[in-house]
Amino acid sequence: MPELPEVETVRKGLEKLLNDFYIERIEVLKERSIASNGGSKSFIDNVKNSYLGNWERRGKYLIGSLLTKEKFSKGFLVVHLRMTGQFKLLEKEVLACKHTRVRFFEERGRELRFIDIRNFGQMWHVPSSRSVPEIVSGIKRLGPEPFSDDFNSHYLEEYLKKKTRSIKSALLDQRTVAGVGNIYADETLFDAGINPKTESRNLKSNELKRLCNSLIKILNISIGEGGTTFSDFRDLEGGNGNYGGQALVYRRSGKNCKKCGEKILREKICGRSTHWCPNCQK
């Protein structure tokens, strides 16, 4: 699943390439891609005849502002890519490929296409009279953004002080911190030198400081590399993310640790494959 760096890469592409994109027509090829009330008909009626304005990211959600030709608000287009969702910008209309789910056409002929092999991705229209969390309930449950002032070691110490689950499990919980998934949880814990099986409540203040610093560091590096592509992720122009080649533990089970030479382990923690070094992460 695309995590924060991949979603941020898509957000940057959408904002850069679609700042003058006027949606004249929409085709919904898969009804389940539309999650807002009223289904595809209501979605099309509310989103067409709109300019795509600024794009924001909240956790793994993309939030695009919709504007009239007079630049008044028409609400928001909210997207969650889930496992395999991706956007592709085409300079002219071409036949839809097999996994095309939603197509946005502009008056000049360009097409913004939403492709989703697994078909778990979702879209919502949020009217200007409502807030995004009112319509997209998952956003209400998100913890702080890693780059926000609200995310720090003091917050983690308070939030985790009674949590008996592993720190790996806590990082994957979007209520702890928004946008982190398996790749960056593993890489962060390695960088911070923390055993992923450690009970969250047992982490000391200095370890939580390292954890915060490592998470921000790893996410910034990955954003700079356009995210990670191991299977389906592509940016708006079809390019791969380049962080995967820099990963120190993720998908390196059985290989030598680049820091100490110990074999990288892979085991299930909280039902997820976890990669870590037993020497560097004690």
UniProtKB/Swiss-Prot annotation:
Alphabetized UniProt keyword annotations: DNA damage, DNA repair, DNA-binding, Glycosidase, Hydrolase, Lyase, Metal-binding, Multifunctional enzyme, Zinc, Zinc-finger
EC number annotated for this UniProt entry: 3.2.2.23, 4.2.99.18
Textual note on the cofactor: Binds 1 zinc ion per subunit.
Subunit organization: Monomer.
Necessary cofactors: Zn(2+)
Organism: Prochlorococcus marinus (strain NATL1A)
Lineage of the species this protein comes from: Bacteria, Bacillati, Cyanobacteriota, Cyanophyceae, Synechococcales
Catalytic activity line of the entry: Hydrolysis of DNA containing ring-opened 7-methylguanine residues, releasing 2,6-diamino-4-hydroxy-5-(N-methyl)formamidopyrimidine; 2'-deoxyribonucleotide-(2'-deoxyribose 5'-phosphate)-2'-deoxyribonucleotide-DNA = a 3'-end 2'-deoxyribonucleotide-(2,3-dehydro-2,3-deoxyribose 5'-phosphate)-DNA + a 5'-end 5'-phospho-2'-deoxyribonucleoside-DNA + H(+)
MF terms in GO: 8-oxo-7,8-dihydroguanine DNA N-glycosylase activity; class I DNA-(apurinic or apyrimidinic site) endonuclease activity; damaged DNA binding; zinc ion binding
Annotated GO biological process: base-excision repair
Active site annotation, chain numbering: 2 (schiff-base intermediate with dna), 3 (proton donor), 60 (proton donor), 272 (proton donor)
Pfam families given in the database record: Fapy_DNA_glyco (PF01149), H2TH (PF06831), zf-FPG_IleRS (PF06827)
Protein name: Formamidopyrimidine-DNA glycosylase
ZnF (FPG-type) intervals: 248-282
Coiled-coil annotated spans: none
Role of this protein: Involved in base excision repair of DNA damaged by oxidation or by mutagenic agents. Acts as a DNA glycosylase that recognizes and removes damaged bases. Has a preference for oxidized purines, such as 7,8-dihydro-8-oxoguanine (8-oxoG). Has AP (apurinic/apyrimidinic) lyase activity and introduces nicks in the DNA strand. Cleaves the DNA backbone by beta-delta elimination to generate a single-strand break at the site of the removed base with both 3'- and 5'-phosphates.
Disulfide bonds: none
